[in-house]
Curated annotation (Swiss-Prot):
Family: Belongs to the frataxin family.
Domain of life: Bacteria
Record-level GO BP terms: iron-sulfur cluster assembly
Gene: cyaY
Database matches in HAMAP family: CyaY
InterPro entries linked: CyaY, Frataxin/CyaY, Frataxin/CyaY_sf, Frataxin_CS
SMART domains recorded: Frataxin_Cyay
Protein name (record): Iron-sulfur cluster assembly protein CyaY
Keywords (A to Z) from UniProt: Iron, Metal-binding
Length: 107
């Protein structure tokens, strides 16, 4: 993949997250902000999730209270370089924990 393809895929990922949060109907207030390719989700309890694109590596990084994860794109999805877990599964798990209620980003 070249840099242009990477940015297109990362943009699609972040847009999907924004659209999902805009449609979230739970009790928790989850704010998001995107600045310079970094998306920060902020939860009512003050905790944060940070999603960051790493252009030189063509990776998307996810930082949660539980730890940091690096994702590579293959076969139409982003997968963790260590566990093989799919990005939206890991994001849903982390957001659910940090929001205190179910938050699903499943496609």
């Amino acid at each position: 993949m070249n840099d242009s393809e990477f940015h297109q895929l990362a943009d699609q990922l972040m847009l999907y997250i924004e659209e999902t949060l805009d449609g979230f109907t739970g009790d928790s207030d989850i704010d998001y902000e995107t600045n310079g390719g970094v998306m920060t989700l902020t939860f009512e309890n003050g905790s944060k999730i940070v999603i960051n694109r790493q252009e030189p590596l063509h990776q998307v990084w996810l930082a949660t209270k539980a730890g940091g994860y690096h994702f590579n794109y293959r076969d139409g999805h982003w997968y963790c370089s260590r566990s093989g877990e799919e990005f939206f599964a890991k994001l849903s798990e982390a957001a659910t924990t940090q929001a205190g209620e179910e938050v699903s980003f499943s496609e």
